[in-house]
Curated annotation (Swiss-Prot):
It holds the Pfam family UbiA. PROSITE patterns: UBIA (PS00943). GO terms for biological process: heme O biosynthetic process. This is Protoheme IX farnesyltransferase. It comes from Erwinia tasmaniensis (strain DSM 17950 / CFBP 7177 / CIP 109463 / NCPPB 4357 / Et1/99).
Length: 295
């Protein structure tokens, strides 16, 4: 039973988000780490993400059973009752928000609330099923964790937080479109209006290329504005150029599914590399904050 309760929280997604939280947190810490704050932020975000994933599993159980990738999920197979899953999700969310509020700061909690509302209320409940722009809206919630990690330390939403939001939002787009291409039949069977299904794979390839170029620019801004050093810049540039090269190779590929899977895998390598580099090659910018939270 414990295994099912763990599975429904999507541990892989939680782990991936924690990497970005750590990146944002350590970027803002600039070598001076408050370990109790660090722990509270990691656990708090983990609980909120877990809550969102359980709610998502509850909402998506009707379409999950139509997809090969998701047909064996806990709620689809009835291993946990829908009502119990809602209670579980609610408890996880309340615990996570409370921990961020009292263990970090109110700004971190409110950022988590906004990310949660976008993911569960806007994306999962409506946009995913009804709009080709669902991925774009969902990317905002996917970018929340590193911003929460950053603001847990800084206590303010400044240019650094805005750049992180841009980097991780833009990264989500080619990452998600790649999944939609190599899982094309799944999304088609479930009638989910993702771009590759609605507009075609060739159009999706164009969007992937444009978003990766925008991602390249956003990653460079951390150094150009003064938040990260030149070691980060070198890695960010190399990763972005390689990812763009992979995207461009898609125009000549004979097998879109294989190409998209490779692009997806490298997207994870890319964002992990950036998270690690911003954690260790940080700087203090001369510019001041855009928006300061006053508690």
């Amino acid at each position: 039973m414990i295994k099912q309760y763990l599975q429904v929280t999507k541990p892989g997604i939680i782990f991936g988000n924690l990497i970005s939280v750590i990146g944002g947190f350590l970027l803002a810490s600039k070598g001076s780490i408050d370990y109790s704050l660090f722990l509270a932020t990691l656990v708090g975000v983990s609980l909120v993400v877990a809550s969102g994933c359980v709610y998502n599993n509850f909402i998506d159980r009707d379409i999950d059973k139509k997809m090969e990738r998701t047909k064996n999920r806990v709620l689809v197979k009835g291993l946990i009752s829908p009502k119990l899953s809602l209670v579980y999700a609610t408890v996880l969310g309340i615990a996570g928000f409370a921990l961020l509020y009292f263990g970090a700061n109110p700004l971190a909690m409110w950022l988590a609330v906004m990310g949660f509302v976008v993911y569960v209320g806007v994306y999962s409940l409506y946009m995913k099923r009804n709009s080709v722009y669902g991925t774009l809206i969902g990317s905002l919630s996917g970018a929340a964790p590193p911003v929460i990690g950053y603001c847990a330390v800084s206590g303010q939403f400044d240019a650094g937080a805005l750049i992180l939001l841009a980097i991780f939002s833009l990264w989500q787009m080619p990452h998600s479109y790649a999944i939609a291409i190599f899982r094309f039949k799944d999304y088609q069977a479930a009638n989910i209006p993702v771009l590759p299904v609605v507009k075609g794979i060739s159009v999706a390839k164009n969007h992937i290329t444009v978003y990766i170029i925008a991602f390249m620019v956003a990653t460079l801004m951390l150094t150009l504005v003064g938040y990260a050093g030149y070691k980060y810049l070198v890695v960010a540039s190399a990763v972005s150029v390689w990812w763009l090269g992979m995207a461009l190779s898609g125009y000549k590929t004979q097998n879109d599914r294989v190409w998209a899977r490779k692009l997806f895998v490298f997207s994870i390598v890319a964002i992990t590399a950036l998270s690690v580099m911003m954690s260790i090659d940080f700087m203090t910018p001369a510019s001041k904050d855009l928006l300061t939270y006053i508690g």
